[in-house]
């Protein structure tokens, strides 16, 4: 595939004009509770096929019907969902046409070992050895060019979000999962590369993500398989792990992905960072000032699903301040759990609206059209509603249930 020169120079539109804000509020006003909750879930295509043998490479009639009942806000494409260029473009187009609200279509395309398209045998795309090799050049322009190149070919196929670049610092030699996916063992150098990469993605018109907050590079375990822990204090994290994340935020990154790591010396709650109000709301939102979309790492990873039921982890993440629940192990259970949490008051609807606003704003920034049956003009809220979540009450219920089960 030849990447069009027009795509390479495509900049992301601004999503913060008064007109854009009005469109978000208009859409929010007309949405049902299930539609709002659906925006919070980004899943693999097969999550919408509840049979044992889903057809992963196309949108089936069954999946279309399930999408009506579980109207997710985005899909995440993996190698198993891809056959060739034509099929991939059709898959994405079919999902977009089937969704009432345009979807975020995301992929892990970091360059190096994690590149669902470039490493696929059916594609002839630019390949990179690793982020580490880019960082080793000491030239941020190399990171910018990689972001621009990857963003351009993803956009050509219909993607609008890349779960890249990696902002972790590879500070623990025993780490089994980050390694060469990180730009450097040096936080300052990693920060320079992250800044340039974010700028490169945006120059290509591609939304991008820094991950895995608050830094998976310092752990000695892989959260895909179980508990992973960083023993650094918050002050130590601010001196190292936070530098690339702060750089990405300053560069205007669109999304921050959380890690399921526990940080016992940085927070007192004992929870994985993805479920920690201290780490998400107080630190990422408060101290670092990030106002964009926060997405969990996959909730189906063992660091979460071994200890929390799908509904529990979904609601706890929202109570912590997360916006998007990525790939729960059971979409229906997690989705229905969030519905129940709103209905019983554990999660206020305005807390829900807070995240939906951010997600819709992100979609506008991607150039997706939110218009439809929404009225052209809707009044904005006259007061600031209660956005609290009964977080302590929810945790009491969660741990009480765990004790009862034990």
Task: Please provide the spans of the model-predicted regions.
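A substrate-binding/cap region within the structured catalytic cores of diverse enzymes
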Residues: 129-159, 164-198, 202
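Preference for extracellular/luminal or secreted protein segments
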Residues: 7-65, 70, 286-287, 305-406
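Substrate-binding cleft of extracellular glycoside hydrolase catalytic domains
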Residues: 103-147
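Bacterial N-terminal signal peptides
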Residues: 2-10, 108
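Divalent metal-dependent hydrolysis catalytic cores, especially in the metallo-beta-lactamase
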Residues: 72-78, 160-168, 321-325
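Second-shell residues forming the walls of enzyme active-site clefts
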Residues: 27-32, 50-62, 81-103, 113-115, ...
